[in-house]
Swiss-Prot record:
GO terms for molecular function: magnesium ion binding; monooxygenase activity; ribulose-bisphosphate carboxylase activity. The lineage of its organism: Eukaryota, Haptista, Haptophyta, Prymnesiophyceae, Prymnesiales. It catalyses: 2 (2R)-3-phosphoglycerate + 2 H(+) = D-ribulose 1,5-bisphosphate + CO2 + H2O; D-ribulose 1,5-bisphosphate + O2 = 2-phosphoglycolate + (2R)-3-phosphoglycerate + 2 H(+). It comes from Haptolina hirta. Heterohexadecamer of 8 large chains and 8 small chains. The gene is rbcL. This is Ribulose bisphosphate carboxylase large chain.
Length: 459
């Protein structure tokens, strides 16, 4: 219905649709709208018993995708009454329920959504938020620094706690569990939590800074997750962690728990690339960012640009803006198809993690800004002089680059020289620069902007 007048309370969705040969794209869009709301494969007489014209989703616009033959952007509007208030499970059951298996479409991808203020007001939003987190950590004017304990699996609890202590003592703000460390036979969660918090408390006492460790509470049941989260709080942790794979209802439940108990909630996006990486089918990661901000997480991994994981510069910028802006406008180069008022939901902190090191610090600050957590796992644990030296190298690299930026220097162009100058009085930084130099994982991204040529990730 190209004449449909969009209401302020409508939920809007944009699908990238590749119809089967011979299928009209307008008909495909109409079928997507129908199947994701009220319709089935045939006319049913019970339609007469409902306000079907109100509840049926409306496909109101179909545009060809630039430079991509036989693929179309299909815009669909949903009435707000189609969705239960504050329930991601109900929302996603409609939006990504049956339609991705439609025979009439060869491929389908959910690119973006717009949520009305009336619906957002029914969601909690981040449990703590960036502003309160900075106040709690007493860290301002720079990105937060972290690292993931490596190796991911196999360490004993005591050795695990030693890694935590060394990293925090060296200058990091956070250490973290990785996505697949839960409560395995080689180290049960209680052992890991106890030794990790011993390391946190010791490092905090020595440094005079607030420190934290993301304790992964992911488990098989909600009862187990609550038990682990409560144990983390009893030990004095300020932050707990979950994985995306636990599901939307579990994520919202942990978001509510974190708000109730005044804890920061970190989300690892484990599993997202199974459906977000390919450009023609699945869903764009920016949609996951929006859902997770609504669900109540405080942190979410959102890309690095220069690291080892998928990350086009423009797309990453769009993800970060989605998590941090209170209001965003249409920005097609960054993949933002709708203006969005976030109804004062708190900011969700993007996390940059995966294949980054101190030699890239000028690039990271340029691309990602201050409001993020930069996590150097291998770039800390892999330092030749040890974990503490790796942490110190990252902290010195960050602070010298922030200082240069604040002095008005062209820190992007001068970045390598700024690091070399700082390394003259910091042996760990010099060792790190000698080892990793300017290594960058510069592969062509699979998910790139449709409306402009993508910039290179190298500076």
């Amino acid at each position: 219905d190209p004449d449909y007048a969009i209401k302020e309370t409508d939920i809007l969705a944009l699908f990238r649709c590749t119809p089967q040969p011979g299928v009209d794209p307008v008909e495909a869009a109409a079928a997507l709208a129908g199947e994701s709301s009220t319709a089935t494969w045939t006319v049913v007489w019970t339609d007469l018993l409902t306000a079907c014209d109100l509840y049926r989703a409306k496909a109101y616009r179909v545009d060809p995708v630039p430079s991509t033959p036989d693929t179309y952007f299909c815009y669909v509007a949903y009435d707000i009454d189609l969705f239960e208030e504050g329930s991601l499970a109900n929302l996603t059951a409609s939006i990504i329920g049956n339609i991705f298996g439609f025979k009439a479409v060869k491929a389908l991808r959910l690119e973006d959504m717009r949520f009305p203020v009336a619906l957002l007001k029914t969601y909690q939003g981040p449990a703590t938020g960036l502003i309160v987190e900075r106040e709690r950590m007493d860290k301002f004017g720079r990105p937060l620094l972290g690292a993931t304990v490596k190796p991911k699996l196999g360490l004993s609890g005591k050795n695990y706690g030693r890694v935590v202590f060394e990293g925090l003592k060296g200058g990091l703000d956070f250490l973290k569990d990785d996505e697949n460390i839960n409560s395995q036979p080689f180290m049960r969660y209680r052992e890991r939590f106890l030794y990790s918090m011993e390391g946190v408390n010791h490092a905090a006492a020595l440094s005079g800074e607030v420190k934290g460790h993301y304790l992964n509470t992911t488990a098989a049941t909600m009862e187990d997750m609550y038990e682990r989260a409560n144990f983390a709080k009893e030990l004095g942790s300020i932050i707990v962690m979950i994985d995306l794979v636990i599901g939307y209802t579990a994520i919202q439940s942990m978001g509510k728990w974190s708000r109730d108990y005044d804890m920061i909630l970190h989300l690892h996006r484990a599993g997202n690339s199974t459906y977000s990486r390919q450009k023609n089918h699945g869903m764009n990661f920016r949609v996951i960012c929006k859902w997770m901000r609504m669900a109540g997480v405080d942190h979410i991994h959102a890309g690095t640009v220069v690291g080892k994981l998928e990350g086009d510069p423009l797309m990453i910028k769009g993800f970060y803006n989605t998590l941090l802006d209170f209001k965003s406008e249409v920005n097609l180069p960054e993949g933002l198809f709708f203006a969005q008022d976030w109804a004062s939901l708190r900011k969700c902190v993007p996390v940059a993690s995966g294949g980054i090191h101190c030699g890239q610090m000028h690039q990271l600050i340029n691309y990602l800004g201050d409001d993020c957590v930069m996590q150097f796992g291998g770039g800390t644990i892999g330092h030749p002089d040890g974990i503490q030296s790796g942490a110190t190298a990252n902290r010195v690299a960050l602070e010298c680059m922030v200082l240069a930026r604040n002095e008005g220097r062209d820190y992007v162009a001068e970045g390598p020289q700024i690091l070399r100058d700082a390394a003259k009085s910091c042996g760990p930084l010099q060792t790190a620069l000698d080892l990793w130099k300017d290594i960058t994982f510069n592969y062509a991204s699979t998910d790139t902007a449709d409306f402009v040529e993508t910039p290179t990730a190298n500076v």
